[in-house]
UniProtKB/Swiss-Prot annotation:
Pfam families registered for this protein in UniProt: ATP_bind_3 (PF01171), zn-ribbon_14 (PF16503)
Encoding gene per record: tut-1
Enzyme Commission number: 2.7.7.-
Major enzyme class: transferase
Pathway field: tRNA modification; 5-methoxycarbonylmethyl-2-thiouridine-tRNA biosynthesis
Biased composition (Basic and acidic residues): 361-372
Record-level Gene Ontology MF annotations: nucleotidyltransferase activity; sulfurtransferase activity; tRNA binding
Region (Disordered): 335-372
CDD domains: CTU1-like
Record protein name field: Cytoplasmic tRNA 2-thiolation protein 1
UniProt KW Metal-binding keyword: no
A biological process term (GO) from this entry: embryonic morphogenesis
C-alpha cells in the first residue's frame, strides 16, 4: 500500500522548517500559517512604501464595515504601524446605512475591533446625515436602483466622517478582486474616462481628502485566509439589497477567468493601469456643488439630486438623465435653495460601487484549493 504523503514543506524565504498549510492565491507559494501572515503583511507594507501612501503624523480614517476586507485592513494597518513605526494616528470610521438585520449586526463586529485594536471609533448614519435610511429608500423606490443611492451616500458619508474626526487621509478595504471587477465594469460601460483612473491606488487628491487602497494587490482569497489564520472576527452575511447589483455580474466573470488563468486578476489591474486616454476624450472638470459644497463635475452633486428626488417624489433624479434633472440644476444655478440638501463639507461624491465584503458559499469553495 502506498504511503500517504504529508503536507509539503513551507516555502518561506525565511528558512522555515514547518509544514505548509496554505497556498497563497496571489503567487501559489505554499506556506505555513505564520509565514503566510508575514508574507501578506509584507505585501501590504511594500505597497504602502512603494506608493508613499502616508506621511508621519497623519490622522488616517479606516473605513470599517465589519466585513472581512475592512477588518483585515484595520488589523494589518495597526500591526504595520506598530512594527514599522509609521507614526500614524489610526481611527475607525463606520457608516450606518439603516439596514435592519444587516448593518446593525455588522456594527457589532466593528465595536469588537475597536476594543481589540484599541482604536477610536466614529459612527455616522444615513438617517442623521440625509434624513433617510436605506430601508426607507428601498420602501419608496424598490430594489432596482438602491445600490446607486447607497453608493453615492456612503462615499459622501465617509468623507464627512473623515473630516469630522480631522483625518487627512481615508483608507478603504478595496482588494485586487474589487479593482479587477471595476476595470471590467468600466470596459463594459464604455466609460473610458473612469477606466483611466479606476485603478489609481490614491484617489481624490484634487480635493481635501485623498483616499488610499493599501489592499489593492491583495487577493480576496488571501484576505479570507489571513483573517482565519489570525482568528479575526468579521461579519460575513451578504447585504439583503445587494444580489441584483451590477457588480455581481462582473464578479462572476472575473472568477470564471481566474479558474482558467490564475493571474487574470492582476492582468486586469495592470491593463487598467496602462490605459492612456486620448486628448479628444473629455475628462470631467471637478468643481463644488452649488447646494452643499461637495466636489462634483456638475452644478449639483449626485447626492443632492438623489435627496431632492426622494423628498419631492421624483426618484429618477440623479439616477437617469432627464429634463427634471436639468430643471433642478438650473434652479440651483439661479440661486434657488431648498431644504433637503446633502449638507456642507468637503470631499467628493459619486457612486463608488461599494465593495462586497461577504464570504458566501462560492468563496468558501474557492478557499478549499488553498488549504492542505
Amino acid at each position: 500500500m502506498e504511503k500517504r504523503r504529508g503536507p509539503p514543506p513551507c516555502q518561506s524565504e525565511e528558512g522555515c522548517s514547518n509544514s505548509a498549510k496554505i497556498r497563497k492565491a496571489k503567487n501559489g507559494a505554499q506556506l505555513c500559517g505564520p509565514c503566510f501572515s508575514k508574507s501578506f503583511e509584507d505585501d501590504v507594507h511594500e505597497t504602502i512604501i512603494n506608493n508613499n501612501l502616508f506621511k508621519r503624523g497623519e490622522r488616517v480614517a479606516i473605513g470599517a464595515s465589519g466585513g472581512k476586507d475592512s477588518t483585515v485592513l484595520a488589523f494589518v494597518m495597526k500591526t504595520l504601524n506598530d512594527r514599522h513605526d509609521y507614526g500614524l494616528d489610526l481611527q475607525l470610521l463606520s457608516i450606518d446605512e439603516g439596514i435592519k438585520g444587516y448593518r446593525d449586526d455588522s456594527l457589532l463586529a466593528v465595536e469588537k475591533n475597536r476594543v481589540e485594536y484599541g482604536l477610536p471609533l466614529t459612527i455616522l448614519s444615513y438617517n442623521d446625515l440625509y434624513g433617510w435610511t436605506m430601508d426607507d429608500i428601498v420602501a419608496k423606490i424598490g430594489k432596482k436602483n438602491n445600490c446607486t443611492f447607497c453608493g453615492v451616500f456612503r462615499r459622501q458619508a465617509l468623507d464627512r466622517g473623515a473630516f469630522k474626526i480631522g483625518a487627512t487621509k481615508l483608507v478603504t478595504g478595496h482588494n485586487a478582486d474589487d479593482m479587477a471587477e471595476t476595470v471590467l465594469m468600466n470596459v463594459l460601460r464604455g466609460d473610458i474616462a473612469r477606466l483611466e483612473r479606476c485603478t489609481n491606488i490614491v484617489t481624490g487628491e484634487e480635493g481635501d481628502l485623498p483616499r488610499a487602497k493599501p489592499l489593492k494587490y491583495c487577493f480576496e482569497r488571501d484576505i479570507v485566509m489571513y483573517a482565519r489564520s489570525n482568528q479575526l472576527e468579521y461579519f460575513y452575511t451578504e447585504c439583503i439589497y445587494a444580489p441584483n447589483a451590477y457588480r455581481g455580474y462582473a464578479r462572476k466573470y472575473v472568477r470564471d477567468l481566474e479558474k482558467v488563468h490564475p493571474r487574470a486578476i492582476l492582468d486586469l489591474i495592470r491593463s487598467g493601469e496602462k490605459v492612456s486616454v486620448k486628448k479628444e476624450v473629455e475628462m470631467p472638470t471637478l468643481k463644488t456643488c452649488e447646494r452643499c459644497g461637495y466636489m462634483t463635475s456638475q452644478k449639483m452633486c449626485k447626492a443632492c439630486l438623489l435627496i431632492e428626488g426622494l423628498n419631492t417624489g421624483n426618484t429618477d433624479l440623479g439616477v437617469r438623465k432627464s429634463k427634471k434633472t436639468k430643471k433642478v440644476i438650473v434652479e440651483t444655478e439661479g440661486g434657488k435653495k431648498e431644504d433637503g440638501g446633502c449638507g456642507s463639507g468637503g470631499g467628493g461624491c459619486g457612486c463608488a460601487g461599494a465593495a462586497d465584503e461577504t464570504e458566501n458559499e462560492e468563496t468558501r469553495k474557492r478557499l478549499k484549493d488553498l488549504q492542505f
